Amino acid sequence: MANPLYQKHIISINDLSRDDLNLVLATAAKLKANPQPELLKHKVIASCFFEASTRTRLSFETSMHRLGASVVGFSDSANTSLGKKGETLADTISVISTYVDAIVMRHPQEGAARLATEFSGNVPVLNAGDGSNQHPTQTLLDLFTIQETQGRLDNLHVAMVGDLKYGRTVHSLTQALAKFDGNRFYFIAPDALAMPQYILDMLDEKGIAWSLHSSIEEVMAEVDILYMTRVQKERLDPSEYANVKAQFVLRASDLHNAKANMKVLHPLPRVDEIATDVDKTPHAWYFQQAGNGIFARQALLALVLNRDLVL
C-alpha cells in the first residue's frame, strides 16, 4: 500500500493532515536513529532557490546527499535564464521538471510554489518558503523538536514573539499545532507586526485559546515553548524597522521563572532578539532545532519519493 505522501506536492502545512504530520515525524525519528545512505540512490532532485537562504538550502541539500540522491540546481536566480533572459517561472519549472524526480523551491513571491505545481507535471514540488506566506518544512522540524523535547504535540502552551506579521514560520507552526488537541497560544508582537487576522480567525473557528501580550515577562512562567523570531529587515521600510527591531529581546535574566523544561526555539538567523548569554542556558534549543532540519527534510523526501517506504 502506497504511503499517502507519495508524489504529493508539499506547498502549505495545510496540505498535511494530522496523520500525515505524525507519519513524517515518526519517519524522521527512524532516520535520525538509523541513517539510510542509499534510500534515494537513483533519484535526482532539483534545489531551486530564487531567494537567499543558508540553513534551509544547506539542510535540504545535505538531506538529499545523505539519502544518496543526486542534486542539481542553483542558489541565485540572477545567474539563470529567468534572471538574465527574462524566462518565466512557468517555463523554468516546465523545463526543470523534465530533468528531475522532485523540485525543492524557495521564491520571494507569495504563491510561487503553488504556481509551480501547475507546470511540474507529475514531479512533486516541495515549498522551501514563498515570500511571507508558508514555510512547511521549517514547521516539520519545529514539530519534531517540540515532540523530542516535550514528549508531545498536544496540551502545550506556546508563546510566539517578534515579527508575527511577515514571519512565515509562525504562520505555518500555528496552523500545524492547531491540528493537535489542547494547545494554547500567546502572541507577543508590536502592533505593526501582529499575527495576521486570518490566523486568529482560524484559531477562533477551532475553539483554540489565544491571547495578545505586550511583553515576554507576562507569559514566561506559563509556557512550554518560547518561539522567538527576528524582525525581517528585508520586508520593512527603514523607519519601521528602526522602531521595532529591539522591542522584544530575550536575555538569560528573563528566564529565572521559566519552567524547567521550557525550550527557546528560533528559526534563525537571529539578530539582536536573543542575547548570546541565553545560549549557555538549558532552555536554549535553537541550534539543536536547526540540526533537526536534516531529519525532518530527509523524512519528507523519503516519503514523497518512495511509494512503499519501509524503514
UniProtKB/Swiss-Prot annotation:
Keywords: Pyrimidine biosynthesis, Transferase
Molecular functions per Gene Ontology: amino acid binding; aspartate carbamoyltransferase activity; identical protein binding
InterPro entries noted in UniProt: Asp/Orn_carbamoyltranf_P-bd, Asp/Orn_carbamoylTrfase, Asp/Orn_carbamoylTrfase_sf, Asp_carbamoyltransf, Asp_carbamoyltransf_Asp/Orn-bd
GO cellular component, one term: cytoplasm
Binding site for carbamoyl phosphate: R55, T56, R106, H135, Q138, L268, P269
Gene Ontology BP terms: 'de novo' pyrimidine nucleobase biosynthetic process; 'de novo' UMP biosynthetic process; glutamine metabolic process; protein homotrimerization
Biological pathway: Pyrimidine metabolism; UMP biosynthesis via de novo pathway; (S)-dihydroorotate from bicarbonate: step 2/3
Binding site for L-aspartate: K85, R168, R230
Keyword Transport: no
Uppermost EC category: transferase
Catalytic activity entry: carbamoyl phosphate + L-aspartate = N-carbamoyl-L-aspartate + phosphate + H(+)
EC number: 2.1.3.2
Function: Catalyzes the condensation of carbamoyl phosphate and aspartate to form carbamoyl aspartate and inorganic phosphate, the committed step in the de novo pyrimidine nucleotide biosynthesis pathway.
Subunit annotation: Heterododecamer (2C3:3R2) of six catalytic PyrB chains organized as two trimers (C3), and six regulatory PyrI chains organized as three dimers (R2).
NCBIfam families, sorted: asp_carb_tr (TIGR00670), PRK00856.1 (NF002032)
Family of this protein: Belongs to the aspartate/ornithine carbamoyltransferase superfamily. ATCase family.
Name of the protein: Aspartate carbamoyltransferase catalytic subunit
Origin species: Escherichia coli (strain K12)
